[in-house]
């Protein structure tokens, strides 16, 4: 295993650790919410307010950990691409090396600053790999197409039998062409919409 591969492993591990921290904060938030209910039932609004503040703090912390986990994971994917293409520059390797120590601290501010530095290193690589990314599906970009996110949210809501009350663009398909599966999905969506209108 090369040094770069070790750093890549550490990046992926850190992303998982950040994800675990987010889940821990979620649990803490739920525990605080339970304490809020108990305090309200006892008529102790002062204590309820403290638990409410704690719950909100834990929720925000969970979101921060989750966001950073996704960001580190995206950078790991880009390192993987660079390693695969043999495009790892000396400056990029230096930044990746300094990541190991920073990621162990789990300090979100330091990790964020390092991610900024790393993403800057990739701007040059992005220019070099643009042609390659045009021919393959881009799995290394740090942003996710909003349309895909909206469609997934709607799909999950439909499975759960919920209504998101969102206006989603209809008929969004890839530039390669419409597959049979997506055509069937569109037809199902239209039938589902008609059924909802009848209810």
Swiss-Prot record:
- Bilayer topology term: Peripheral membrane protein
Keywords tagged on the record: Cell cycle, Cell division, Coiled coil, Cytoplasm, Endosome, Membrane, Protein transport, Transport
User: Its Gene Ontology molecular function terms?
Assistant: identical protein binding; MIT domain binding
Q: Where is this region: Interaction with IST1?
A: 132-156
Q: Which domain of life is it from?
A: Eukaryota
UniProt entry tagged with the keyword Ligase: no
Q: Which residue ranges does the record annotate as region Interaction with VPS4B?
A: 183-199
Q: What segments bear the compositional bias annotation Polar residues?
A: 170-182
| Any one of the GO BP annotations | late endosome to vacuole transport
Q: Where is this region: Interaction with VPS4A, MITD1 and STAMBP?
A: 180-196
Q: What is this protein called?
A: Charged multivesicular body protein 1b
